[in-house]
């Protein structure tokens, strides 16, 4: 009897060791343990304003206890949500970091398809000033289609009764039983002079859940406010940009040659001052004492899709884990 008990104990210990080993391996790949209630999927990982065959534009979804929270909705967001196995009719909360089209171009499609899924509960979109205007414009764009579908008898609830935009400022902008979301204004638009100075807002978001803290930089240059927001985060999803790769890509496809000198100067000013470089990301992550950096919003490289050198550059200034996001990657 004692031998059987010893054998059972040995077996249980072995199973526990295997389980812990599997959990450790999963976490080393940026995947939380099966016990975690929070999941992040990077839906779209390309920077804009171009399109790419391998990556959709910026979009993410955080899922907490089965509730989905979308962060940005660039072109391709709805398709990627479907590919991730998420029913669009279950999307109820969307956060927009700023109003560049590579972060919002897919919002209207996502809204329309969610409505077509017989969604009747409100869908709320939170973001910088003019988010309410953006949502109303998207509703108006699909108004003719919605009118026809209602006339066909397939829908009865007007699309305008489902979607609501909310202009928010810095601070805690949303909270429920699963999550608390805090926003700070970042420096993505801080370089503007003249009449445009201070007119447009770009936000970074901190998501606090029962088991994780995830911070999305959105598009930003260096920013003390974002560094403070990111303190102690489990995941820092950082926009990643290369002004030289961006310029070379535009030269290769002819856009650069089609620009006036002032347009070229404006593009490069925005690319260098309104975005972080790899050194900036590493230093921010170190100062904020984050655990893992996820590089996303990736500028298209010329002649290669290998971003390993970018991760290595960040690691020169940050001792934690650095991961390169791909579309539909889970963390």
Residue ranges with predicted function:
Residues 1-11:
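Bacterial N-terminal signal peptides that target proteins for export
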Residues 2, 26-215, 221, 304, ...:
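Binuclear metal-dependent hydrolase catalytic cores
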Residues 10-19:
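Bacterial N-terminal signal peptides
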Residues 20-26:
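Sec/Tat signal peptide C-region and signal peptidase I cleavage site
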Residues 200-204, 210-215, 221-321, 325-326:
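Cap/insert and terminal regions of metallo-dependent hydrolase folds
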